[in-house]
Amino acid sequence: MPKEITDIKKFMKLWQNNKDTPATAGAKKVVYVKTNKRITKFKLRGKKYLYTFKTADPKIAKGIKDAIPATYSKIEIKGKNTKKATKRS
């Protein structure tokens, strides 16, 4: 289930001491970073939830990227163009 977090400090605490995050659950430790033209999204998979934090400020996004612990893998995903894909039959 997805869960959006709007506070930076709460998102950063998920890496440290939360029973739901991979740090204590023994799961795969991966942070997905999806960058579009305007918004950067950070996604952290927990045991129960997929935590998402998004920001439009590139300085904040760079700070969060630098703050990701070395124990986590960081996978960067480039966003698609803003044009919608058409369905072909």
UniProtKB/Swiss-Prot annotation:
Please list the GO biological process terms of this entry: protein-RNA complex assembly; translation
Pfam families assigned: Ribosomal_L38e
Q: Which GO terms describe its cellular component?
A: cytosolic large ribosomal subunit
**Keywords for this entry?**
Ribonucleoprotein, Ribosomal protein
InterPro entries attached to this UniProt entry = Ribosomal_eL38, Ribosomal_eL38_sf
- Regions crossing the membrane: none
Ribonucleoprotein in keyword set = yes
In the record, what terms sit under GO molecular function?
Answer: structural constituent of ribosome
Q: Looking at the record's lineage, which domain of life comes first?
A: Eukaryota
**Which family does the record claim for this protein?**
Belongs to the eukaryotic ribosomal protein eL38 family.
The protein, known as: Large ribosomal subunit protein eL38
The record lists the organism as Tetrahymena thermophila (strain SB210)
Q: What is the lineage of its organism?
A: Eukaryota, Sar, Alveolata, Ciliophora, Intramacronucleata
